[in-house]
Amino acid sequence: MQIAWVALGGAIGAVARYVLSNAVYAWLGRAFPWGTLSVNLLGSFIMGLLFYLFTQRLMVPEALKPLVLVGGLGAFTTFSTFSLETLNLMQSGSWSLALLNMLSSVLLCVLAAYLGLVVGRLI
């Protein structure tokens, strides 16, 4: 049954990623992978927040954890798209944007997860 919960969360997370990243691209354009960066930042923050709340503060059903954390946020965030977009920037000769994407994605997503944990502690 747990696999079904992960699959349901994955379906919801994938659709949410598609909608949000396309909205960001429509707003900011596609010269830089803003859509992927935005979903990864938001997903990292939510992952840190909910991980802390689920393990330290809230009594949630066990089925909810894999549904939200593994399925939902796992499908919402995307390392493979980040990798492909970075390679595309490199192949087009935009090395500075590729480096910016690598550094900002890794550093800011780890910072976002940490901030999520901090906010969870404050709630």
From Swiss-Prot:
Q: Which UniProt keywords apply?
A: Cell inner membrane, Cell membrane, Ion channel, Ion transport, Membrane, Metal-binding, Sodium, Transmembrane, Transmembrane helix, Transport
Q: What is its main location?
A: membrane
Give this protein's Gene Ontology molecular function annotations: fluoride channel activity; metal ion binding
Catalytic activity field: fluoride(in) = fluoride(out)
Activation/inhibition comment: Na(+) is not transported, but it plays an essential structural role and its presence is essential for fluoride channel function.
Q: Where does Na(+) bind?
A: G74, T77
InterPro entries to which the protein is assigned, alphabetical: FluC
Q: What are the annotated GO cellular component locations? A: plasma membrane
The answer on whether this UniProt entry bears the keyword NAD reads: no
Q: Mind telling me which residue stretches traverse the membrane in this protein?
A: 3-23, 34-54, 67-87, 99-119
The Gene Ontology biological process terms listed for this entry are: cellular detoxification of fluoride
Membrane topology designation: Multi-pass membrane protein
Cellular compartment(s): Cell inner membrane
The protein's role, per its UniProt record? Fluoride-specific ion channel. Important for reducing fluoride concentration in the cell, thus reducing its toxicity.
Q: Please report which protein family the annotation says this sequence is part of.
A: Belongs to the fluoride channel Fluc/FEX (TC 1.A.43) family.
Q: What is this protein called?
A: Fluoride-specific ion channel FluC
Q: Which gene encodes it?
A: fluC
